[in-house]
Curated annotation (Swiss-Prot):
It comes from Pisum sativum (Garden pea). SUPFAM superfamilies: Glycerol-3-phosphate (1)-acyltransferase. The gene is GPAT. This is Glycerol-3-phosphate acyltransferase, chloroplastic. Esterifies acyl-group from acyl-ACP to the sn-1 position of glycerol-3-phosphate. The enzyme from chilling-resistant plants discriminates against non-fluid palmitic acid and selects oleic acid whereas the enzyme from sensitive plants accepts both fatty acids. This is an oleate-selective acyltransferase. GO terms for molecular function: glycerol-3-phosphate O-acyltransferase activity. GO terms for biological process: CDP-diacylglycerol biosynthetic process; phosphatidylglycerol biosynthetic process.
């Protein structure tokens, strides 16, 4: 987050841009060549090994040779059918993209540290993520696990290294960068091999379909959700992309400052639509920055208000202000309590935006894939654990403020009652997902309130 913010109006684009990349083997030390083919929804399980990537360069000509401007700024260009090796090299350092095996990757990290181009602390994190990602993908049992790891990790390390050299600065409203490098597909393809789709579920899929219809009518959708891990946006998109690619690609996430400042997180954040804010949990970490953070949050709220006035927006927000943690006395994971002020501020923005608005409770269970530290930490640089596991999301019917608070005596009680209704719904749905995934009940965990399905089948 910085003090410079520019308004960037967003409009819904119903031309789906889902693209699948296929990597073809190349001779040793020669640049990998990437080709796109259109993504087609099917009734089969989401592809895993075929969706790994070495590079996500879009099929367009590029008008500059500067790697920093190519990586971080949208430039005018004309369509072309093929991406040349020179275009690929113009937006990357090649140190990691040229790696042919694990030894090349690890020696590349060491080489950049010795050259003084990569801080030792970031290098240690890169190596840790590589080894943990490798372990998780191998445990998935995919016969092409080693190829997937090399392809996806070299792409990630390349993007991290580029950002170290030319740090990307997020605006208050950040639009996912799809060109010349497709950061959205990069994130999808990186997280996909970590998801056990056989033990993953979506609750109340018809309601998600209803949301898409409301978006087409110009309505706004707000998802009041719990927050489990840095992988939440990718998990939501992966579980919806086969049936609802528009929602998967156009969801806007209210994001805390850590995911847009931590080098290991930034490449994934660049590929998502974001409203950038400072979390209440870290607002007072540095007293000297409190005033700046509050002013920045005010700017972000104004950006959000402008978006909502344009209509057809779907926004995800975690009113808890941070990720869920295990309950102290039991060690069980549960949604963190919602902050009533955050809920009320969001509701007021929707109510005063003009277009009709709908607020839905959303539950997500995915902490096993990238669990956060057991307690909130002030310092940046947490240990990054990665696992292969089933995941789930669920929504419930929208909750009306007026109906929920009709009997409340004053605004404060109304605010608390509405927050409780949303939180209770999220908790109820979360328990169903937990029963299906951790309790291994699968689709049989469905209840009259939550109907589980696997829409990718």
């Amino acid at each position: 987050m910085t003090d410079s913010f520019a308004h960037c109006a967003s409009h819904i684009n119903y031309r789906h841009k889902m693209k699948t990349m296929f990597i073809f083997s190349t001779p040793c030390c020669s640049p990998s060549t990437a080709f796109f083919s259109p993504f087609r929804a099917s009734n089969s399980k989401p592809l895993r090994s075929t969706l790994s990537l070495r590079s996500s360069i879009s099929s367009s000509s590029i008008t500059s040779t500067s790697h920093c401007s190519l990586a971080f700024n949208i430039v005018k260009h004309k369509e072309k059918n093929v991406v040349s090796a020179n275009m690929t090299s113009s937006v990357s350092s090649r140190t990691f993209l040229n790696a042919q095996n694990e030894q090349d990757v690890l020696s590349g990290i060491k080489k950049e540290v010795e050259a003084g181009t990569l801080p030792a602390s970031i290098a240690a994190g890169m190596e840790e993520v590589y080894l943990n990602y490798k372990s998780a993908v191998i445990k998935s049992g995919d016969p092409k696990a080693n190829e997937i790891v090399l392809s996806n990790m070299t792409a990630l390390l390349d993007r991290i290294f580029l950002d170290v050299k030319e740090p990307f600065v997020f605006e208050a409203h950040h639009k996912a960068k799809r060109e010349p490098f497709d950061y959205y597909m990069f994130g999808q393809n990186y997280i996909r091999p970590l998801v056990d789709f056989e033990t993953s579920y979506v609750g109340n899929m018809p309601l998600f379909i209803q949301m898409e219809e409301q978006l087409k009518q110009g309505h706004n959708i707000i998802l009041m959700s719990n927050h489990q891990s840095e992988a939440d946006p990718a998990i939501i998109a992966l579980l919806l992309e086969m049936r609802l690619p528009h929602i998967a690609e156009n969801l806007i996430y209210v994001a805390g400052d850590r995911v847009i400042t931590v080098p290991l997180c930034k490449p994934f954040s660049i590929g998502r639509n974001l409203i950038c804010v400072y979390s209440k949990k870290h607002m007072l970490d540095n007293p000297e920055l409190v005033d700046m953070k509050r002013k920045a949050n005010t700017r972000s709220r104004k950006e959000m208000a402008m978006l909502l006035r344009s209509g057809s927006q779907i926004i995800w927000i975690a009113p808890s202000g941070g990720r869920d943690r295990p309950v102290a006395n039991s060690g069980e994971w549960a949604p963190a309590p919602f902050d009533s002020s955050s809920v009320d501020n969001m509701r007021r923005l929707v109510d005063h935006s003009g277009p009709p608005g709908h607020i839905y409770p959303l539950a997500i269970l995915c902490h096993d894939i990238m669990p956060p530290p057991l307690k909130v930490e002030k310092e940046i640089g947490e240990k990054r654990i990665i696992s292969y596991h089933g995941t789930g999301i669920s929504t419930a019917p929208e909750i009306s403020f007026s109906n929920t608070t009709a009997a409340c005596e004053n605004p404060e009680k109304a605010k608390d009652a509405y927050t409780k209704a949303l939180y209770d719904s999220v908790t109820e749905q979360y328990d169903v997902l937990k029963s299906a995934i951790h309790g291994k009940k699968g689709l049989q965990a469905s209840t009259p309130v939550v109907s589980l399905s696997q829409p990718w089948k």
